[in-house]
Amino acid sequence: MKRHFFSGKIIASPSLFLLICTAFIFAQLAHAQVSSKKEEKLDFNIPKDTYFNNAVHPKGTGKSFFNFGDILVARAILPAASFSEGPSSGQYIGSGLINQQPVPFLNKQPIQGFSAIVNNYDGTFIALSDNGFGSIENSSDYNLRLYRIKPKFKTFFLSGNGTIETKGFIELRDPNNLIPFAITNHFSESRVLTGADFDIESVQRTKNGDYWIGDEFGPFLLHFDKDGILLDPPIPLPDYENPGKELRAKQNPFSEESSALRIMNAMRAHAKTNGSKSPVMSPWFVMLDDNNENTSVNSRENPPAGLKKASSELHNVSSLNKAGHQVVVYTVNDLENMNLLLELGVQGIISDRPDILLEAVQNFDKNKDGQPDYIDANGLIDVNIFDAQGHRGSRNLRPENTLPAMEAALDFLMPTLETDCGITLDGVPILDHDPHIEASKTRKADGTTYEFDDEVLVKDLTFDQIQKTFIADKILNGRPAQTNDLTLSPVAVAFAKQNELIDPYVMPSLQQLFDFVSFYIEYYKNGPGSTTNQASKRWKNASKVRFNIETKINPRTDTDDRGDIFSDRTVDPETFTKAIADVIVANNLTDRADIQSFDFRTLLIAHKQYPEIRTVCLFGDFPKVGDAGDGTNLQDQNGQNTPWLAGLYWPYRNTSQETPFRIKSSGGFEGMALSTDGTKLLPLLEKSLEGSSSNSLLIHEFDLENKKYNGNSFDYPLNEKASAIGDFIMFSNTRGLIIERDGSQGDLNGFKAIYEIQLDQNKRQIEKRLNVDLLKINDRRKISLPGLEGDIGIGKDFAFPFVTIESVVVFNPFLIGVLNDNNYPFSVGRHVGTGLPDDNEFILLWLDQPLGRRWRNPKGIKNETMVNDIKAYPNTFDEQVTFSNISKGNDVSITIYDISGAVVKKLLVHEKSTDASSFIWNATNDLNQKVSQGIYIAIIEIDGVFTKKKLIKK
């Protein structure tokens, strides 16, 4: 593009500079008029923003600076470290400093990441702040908002202070429970939406004031009223290539793969609201997303009749950890898988074989420094960094949930004892996995027969009856290392003798477990075991051992293999939780005991009534098929959502095997245009589909009246240098703008561009033309100066070198605004010298080529007024100026500006011309006062075609 520059001395007088500049511009304009006698009508039919026409630049709505390049005429900045009221945020992006910014942000929300903008036509805008910190994992504490902003632009005439004022916000929320899946604030009354619920990237406002927002996690369309209240359930995107399917991203909540993260966010938010600790996630290890073909759920790989085949690759440890959720897996009994899980980065392992688990942890040295990573100075497992748990004590070494089983776990230095509880008739928590006292595990002390048909429910017997009747020392098939040899359990034998128990293998109460651990400490510290080889480690470990106690309760209302209703086999959830928690509190163990459950109702009760006790959320798929199984805990019940998760939605066995993730990560509705007639939305995917052989992006039509996609779609060809789009708007029925960008920041050789596009209902492929190179902008007045030391892209050769540029707004055919998404506190695209994070910048550009110009010479155009034949005489005047040569039937507007860009007189506003019309300006302003001498500019619009005339008042 040809450039013109002044040379010579600096001109001191601004008015003289403008006079010379104006003369120079008109010289260029005259050249353009000679070469083009007739101008095309611009394809432009959105409202023109007169606020900025009148206030920014003397061109008004006039001709572009052909051959001058795109000119920066105004700029405003919202500093990176700008905050609004709200809860603490950034808690899951780290701690300390990020690009010199202290994180997290305590008791405040950053005003950042503007992803889209809506013009209020009063000098203010609605700016959409995106999901927070860039991912579903780290943004659950970022509230989704629409901010009202007012830029005070530093302009071409160096007026304005270049700041952006925030005038308030609209918080997006779902108080009417229209969202069917789990959201972070699921259990709250207002249900404020967060960046872990949706990644909002585009917004349009309809005539009634409603907001439509495009999301990337679904992707979904979201419909809100003017106050930010959700009006409809999230609307998914149909996959027209696969009828009956949806186009989904991997974060889609209707797939199992991302559902656990959403549920854990909801459980944590509920816990925090009630002053409790963050819950731990505890999944079945074969359901981890670990790319291990040897770990899967057989009933998912080879489903019985009535169940779908589904992937077992569900729970991603890295994703959950990034979201701040600890992951402790169950039940792992072999060294190979233990080592794989240690490498994967789980925070704990629950095992039936504490002996093997101890070996694995003692030998784990990921950083290769010659020292085991999780062993402390005393040779014990440091539970603060890794939690090794003996499952039901040590199920594969001793009969489960007994004192000898707990003793074996302590002998092998497990820092946590995992166990299950039932509640007796007299309200005593007793160690037991099943609602019935099972004949396969127990026998009667008096030797009488006890078979399956004789089994009784724990809830129907008192604790005293159970302890005097049953001995739980049976050896189970398939557990070759399991033994009930009492010579291996000296502490349990001694404890039973001291407490006059009928056998060391009685079914102990929770209180007896706590007492037994105290007895164990004394046994090895000062008692008979004090001289043994491992005595010191054993009592020291036992003195700080933790307890992970499960509420064994089933909320299903169908029947088991006996015909009994599941939920009737135990006490109610509140009674269950209270019985266990009260024993924990009475023993001052609230810092060392967790309550875990597959039934999340009990966990919610614990949050509310016992916030000092941490909870653990168990996840597993043990389906009920016919009379077999108990449906723990993800399976639906008779087609209704699982009853185990306290109302939180689980899309049972809906995985990527059934509906592949065709939307790429961060590839959803980055841009979304509104048709200029206000009837359709045009959401645009940010990236091409997975597996696509082309670099084309899909645009779909959405009918606003019916709130449905109409089946029409278009392909947008992305430039080969680009990795994504940033925004999409329409300024006429067929024309629009799309921002394209690569992934670079701070690189003046990168790719950041705005394309004008043409949409034809009869063509699938969208046409495009480059309109603005955002790395080559002419800042002739050096509006962007001064900057910080080492800033790039400021000064005469201005650039927008940000990694994400996601907002464009059109004011008139010649003037557009562009905003970056500053990704606070991460991105450094401007301040590379200081390393400070990017600000939010709002720039106004006068375009070298106006929007809506015809790309080809159209046929059959009717005769129109030749705008360059219009005469303004005399152009040097005393009393008046006459505008003539305007044909009959034209729509005419004439506005007079002074040299500073201020409107002097609106002479005509869309008046119809008559035969040989002429119009007179009598040299007065809008207040009917005579104007002073000087240079004036008449901007003449005839049927949407613009020209300008220079006038000199003597």
Residue ranges and their predicted role:
Residues 33-255, 259, 273-276, 640-857:
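Sequence/structural signature of beta-propeller domains
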Residues 245, 254-646, 651, 655:
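Phosphate-group recognition and catalysis centered on beta-loop-alpha active-site segments
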Residues 858-888, 896-902, 933, 950-954:
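Surface-exposed, proline-anchored Ser/Thr-rich loop/turn motifs
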Residues 890, 915, 932-935:
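A glycine-anchored, Pro-Gly-centered beta-turn/N-cap motif
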Residues 920, 929-954:
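C-terminal tail/sorting-segment detector
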Residues 1-12:
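N-terminal secretory signal peptides that target proteins for export/translocation
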Residues 15-27:
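Bacterial N-terminal signal peptides
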